[in-house]
Amino acid sequence: MRRHDPIVAIASAAGRGAIGIVRVSGNALGALAQALCGRALQPRMATYLAFRDARGQPIDQGLALYFPGPHSYTGEDVLELQAHGGPVVLQLLLARCLEAGAGADPATGRPCLPGLRLAQPGEFTERAFLNDKIDLAQAEAIADLIDASTEAAARSASRSLSGAFSAGIHGLCDALIALRTLVEASLDFPEEETDFLHQADARGQLSRLRQALGAVLQQARQGALLRDGIEVVIAGQPNAGKSSLLNALAGAELAIVTPVAGTTRDKVQQTIQIEGVPLRIIDTAGLRASDDEVERIGIARSWEAMAAADAVLFLHDLARAQTPKYIADDAEIERALARKLPPGVAVIDVWNKLDCVAAPAELAAPTAPTESAAVPPASARPAPAPRPAVQLSARTGQGLDGLRRILLEVAGWQSVPEGICIARARHVQALQMAAAHLEQAADQLQARGAALELLAEELRLAQNALDSITGAFTSDDLLGAIFARFCIGK
């Protein structure tokens, strides 16, 4: 399988629709277009015609569009056949393309398009990248635009697709190249009396570059949050109102709510958005000791979900909060949270059923008794940082806005002006790596003397990290992993 083979695929979504598209990309598609359409096509003009099989029998009627390269999506010749969006019709058109490609061109006697094959997922966009129609960040933005779950994510992906995010990276690279030029000049001409670095204020340039990179990194973190969101698990004792809270946050009756404890046996999840940030909210089985095998399986899955989450809403029932058994059971869950949750999982105490009590309670996490005498007394230990806490009523909606604010804070979301671009975790990692190398470069520049070679190397590594974002410096393995996630035909 070669990158220059002509390729064909159904480019529209699977299933039935008003319109379906079959797309072909390759070099010299004129003969194939003639065979498929029965006439020569005028470039970049839609032609209405009948699509016929090899025997001249009609398949469908629709539009044919021909885009000669390099002025096309892929940079190669592109042919699009737009027909009615029935799966059978599109499969017939796809088969006809493959058949016509292998068939003889009446003018030459050779195949119309030798080597025409089915495209791999993302191969059309990969060719656009390889032919310099878009860079790697823009290619990823196409997939992110298709997969966007919120309006904010879609608009941010569109800005990245337009090249706004890449422009910021290119600006950093340009400043970095200018700085590298000074360092290389100092290395290549050590006998010169001119101090290139001092004369050009290399320290000032590096400081400004680090500040600019920090700003791009902060925006990239926000862009990645818009794309990926966070996963939040609702946990607590049975009948604390977990399913009611899920329904309240989702604004729909997704989970069954009854007075019977243990109604939820398995995970129920829904994606919501708060200020454009997607949050996957998961309702789980109530945590308690149980002899019911099915319920025990559900509880085990609850703990698995919590361990994989970004945040856990530990739900407490204000109506039962003063009863000894409830206090003891909550404390047992608290001990299990401390034992089972990995570092980094935020726990938020949510006191539900505010509508069932006469006055708000004093917010505090359940006390988990120590299990070992070896644990130092509280007076000898530093006080733990207070956990976020909120009182609310899932039934009336009172306090939900406060919970939403806390969730955004836990996610790390900051209100940013219009113009944020979508980003991915790999972009954030690359920017962090570049920042680390620039920090090392600043240390070397401060030392000066024999450290110029190390300074030059740190700057080179920083540029490699930035170039990996746009694809100027990228391994084939990374390209394969990125484009394999695209749908076929894109």
UniProtKB/Swiss-Prot annotation:
Where the protein is mainly located, per its record? cytoplasm
For whether the record's keyword set contains Hydrolase, the answer is yes
Q: Which cofactors does this gene product need?
A: K(+)
Record's subunit section = Homodimer. Heterotetramer of two MnmE and two MnmG subunits.
Co-factor note (free text): Binds 1 potassium ion per subunit.
Q: Where is GTP bound in this sequence?
A: 239-244, 258-264, 283-286, 393-395
**What keywords tag this UniProt record?**
Cytoplasm, GTP-binding, Hydrolase, Magnesium, Metal-binding, Nucleotide-binding, Potassium, tRNA processing
Source organism superkingdom: Bacteria
Protein's GO biological process: tRNA methylation; tRNA wobble uridine modification
- Record protein name field: tRNA modification GTPase MnmE
Where composition is biased (Low complexity), the residues are: 366-382
Enzyme Commission no: 3.6.-.-
Q: Name one Pfam family in it.
A: MMR_HSR1
